[in-house]
A protein has these predicted regions:
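Catalytic cores of the polymerase beta-like nucleotidyltransferase superfamily
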Residues: 1-360
Length: 360
């Protein structure tokens, strides 16, 4: 732990914290930074707890030095950001004492404290042992019940840090996911997005250990999806078709992944899940033609249902088909009505697509 503390002290000494600590009555670093420093993960976020009387003084300190900051909750939570070095500093009011504050934390490895002013670490021995042994364990039996979002955070931490989950904590996480319906969609969304960017091999192992559902057979498929550049297009600014493609597999087994989508994203996922495509020309062409405005919907359906050796072929087909241009001038001159015109154009497109299909 000494190496981790030295890294933290060295990092903080280069920030405004080095001066701030001389102007407050107490300043305790807690949680993720200590954990990440111990595991050798680059430091980005620093969470502090301070006395209520110091909180306003910290705000004034930042204003005077023109350090970018804002308040998420005037009474309880103040988020401060130092733009000079891209670190995020969170300041929260200490809950009476370190012991009481620690008891309200989520997991033991996040309930380790460092007293910045006195340069002393404060933590229970068993909490430090969990960190050293890479064991995810709740601080107390009500930790996840108090805030069900911690169930997803636990899954993510276990994935990202290759943690084993303590037996009773597994039970609490499983119970917690059933309570996510009571959590704001925005908070769930943030955690699920992070989970989607975790190592899927680790995620599959964690989900198996928690819920008994073995998705190991999907790993080659997930790896293939990651390589599909055609699925990189964003549905929203923070979610891509690649993300929805993965989710369309996960939701078949884990309902709690359904709690975070926007209406538009749900429509896409439902189409992906319900679209049935067979591996023959007629079925592929109909899926392509009926989804020309959003070709990625059938591509996602293909990526999650076809044999892996046929997925690449289908993706190549759709890519080539999308580049085919049909000269409609002659059709327009034939005097066909709108319905007849559409049927004729489809027929000509199908002929050209069939040629490409037979060449591959």
């Amino acid at each position: 732990m000494e190496r981790a503390l030295n890294l933290i002290k060295e990092t903080l000494s280069k920030t405004f914290i080095n001066l701030l600590k001389t102007e407050v009555s107490n300043l305790y670093l807690v949680g993720g930074a200590l954990r990440d420093a111990y595991y050798g993960i680059p430091l980005k976020d620093f969470d502090f707890v301070v006395s209520k009387s110091d909180l306003e003084g910290i705000r004034d300190f930042l204003k005077e030095r023109k350090i970018s900051h804002f308040s998420l909750n005037e009474e309880r939570f103040l988020l401060l950001r130092a733009n000079s070095n891209n670190f995020t500093f969170d300041f929260m009011i200490l809950d009476d004492s370190i012991e009481k504050d620690a008891n309200k934390r989520d997991f033991t490895m996040n309930a380790l404290y460092y007293d910045v002013k006195s340069d002393k670490s404060i933590f229970k021995g068993e909490f430090l042992n969990d960190l050293k042994n890479r064991v995810l364990s709740v601080v107390n039996d009500d930790s996840i019940k108090l805030d069900p979002i911690r169930s997803l955070r636990g899954i993510r931490l276990a994935c990202d840090l290759s943690l084993s989950i303590e037996t009773s904590t597994k039970k609490f996480i499983c119970e917690g996911v059933s309570l996510l319906k009571n959590v704001s969609k925005e908070r769930v969304r943030e955690e699920v997005k992070k989970i989607l960017h975790s190592d899927f091999k680790e995620l599959v192992e964690i989900l198996k250990s928690l819920f008994g559902q073995d998705l190991t057979g999907f790993l080659p498929r997930f790896n293939l999806i990651e390589k599909m550049d055609l699925l990189d297009k964003e549905v929203n600014k923070d979610v891509s078709f690649k993300d929805l493609c993965k989710i369309s597999v996960l939701v078949k087994y884990f309902n709690f992944f359904l709690t975070w989508f926007t209406g538009r994203e749900m429509q896409y996922i439902e189409k992906m899940v319900n679209l049935k495509i067979e591996n023959n020309f007629d079925s592929l062409f109909e899926a392509f033609f009926n989804n020309t405005r959003e070709m990625r919907i059938p591509l996602c359906a293909i990526a999650t249902s076809f044999d892996l050796r046929d997925v690449l072929k289908a993706f190549s087909l759709f890519d080539k088909w999308s580049k085919i241009k049909i000269d409609t001038n002659a059709i327009k001159k034939s005097g066909l009505n709108k319905r007849e015109f559409g049927a004729k154009k489809k027929k000509l497109l199908k002929i050209e697509c069939k040629k490409v299909y037979e060449e591959i």
